[in-house]
Amino acid sequence: MQNIKCVVVGDGAVGKTCMLISYTTNGFPSEYLPTVFDNYCANLMLDGKPYSLGLWDTAGQEEYDRLRPLSYPQTDVFLICFSIISQSSFENVSTKWFKEVNHHAPGVPIVLVGTKQDIRNDNDSIKKLKERNIELVPYEKGLEKAKEINAIYLEASALTQRGVKNVFDQCIRSVIYPNKLNKKPKKKTCTIM
């Protein structure tokens, strides 16, 4: 059985822990408890082969900025999460999270996840958000950001479990098929004769 280490990062309260609990227990937590550090493990079959997926849940709060990178050594894949209802968490993907993981673990595959995807189809929630001048991060912006950081982009909802299994399947695939999923842009060369 191949072991794969997946470290989950992103701003506080974007839904990292909820997504992990939803995936590992098929349930949704009833209250928000900020994470300091947690581990989960999922044994599964993918493409006919067994895997042990070690899931490392990290704290997104600034006060853990010095502690969090201690979980990065030997990481096989990073999940960078943002909430589709939080522009600041989306902006922090490139200004904080990508910089941090790329500094400590350059070249490790990344899956970018827009959480709380169920809200896209909930007109009541969208109306309430608009009343508070909160715009959803468009799906296309997520795709653009993923391309910018050389990541795969997915959206998921821990509440409805839509897309959650696919997120973790893609984490495994990005490790076992690295060149197929995380294509690096080809560098152009200049030859002088």
From Swiss-Prot:
Its membrane topology: Lipid-anchor
- Supply the PANTHER family for this chain: RHO FAMILY GTPASE
Keyword Nucleotidyltransferase attributed: no
Annotated residues that bind GTP are located at: 10-17, 57-61, 115-118
Matching entries from InterPro entries are given as:
P-loop_NTPase (IPR027417), Small_GTP-bd (IPR005225), Small_GTPase (IPR001806), Small_GTPase_Rho (IPR003578)
**Which Gene Ontology MF annotations are present?**
GTP binding; GTPase activity; protein kinase binding
Name the UniProt key words of this record, in alphabetical order.
Cell membrane, GTP-binding, Lipoprotein, Membrane, Methylation, Nucleotide-binding, Prenylation
List residues, modification Cysteine methyl ester: 190
Which portions of this protein are annotated as coiled-coil regions?
A: none
Which family does the UniProt entry place this protein in?
Belongs to the small GTPase superfamily. Rho family.
What's the protein called, per UniProt?
Answer: Rho-related protein racF2
Q: Which domain of life is it from?
A: Eukaryota
Where, subcellularly, is it found? Cell membrane
Q: Is the keyword Nuclease assigned to this protein?
A: no
What high-level taxonomic lineage is stated for the organism? Eukaryota, Amoebozoa, Evosea, Eumycetozoa, Dictyostelia
Species of provenance: Dictyostelium discoideum (Social amoeba)
Residue ranges annotated as propeptide are 191-193
Q: Where is the lipid attached (S-geranylgeranyl cysteine)?
A: 190
Tell me where the sequence motif Effector region sits in this chain: 32-40
Please give the GO cellular component terms listed in this UniProt entry: cell projection; cytoplasmic vesicle; cytoskeleton; plasma membrane
Q: Where are the transmembrane segments?
A: none
Listed under GO biological process in this entry are: actin filament organization; aggregation involved in sorocarp development; cell-cell adhesion; cortical cytoskeleton organization; establishment or maintenance of cell polarity; mitotic cytokinesis; regulation of actin cytoskeleton organization; regulation of cell shape
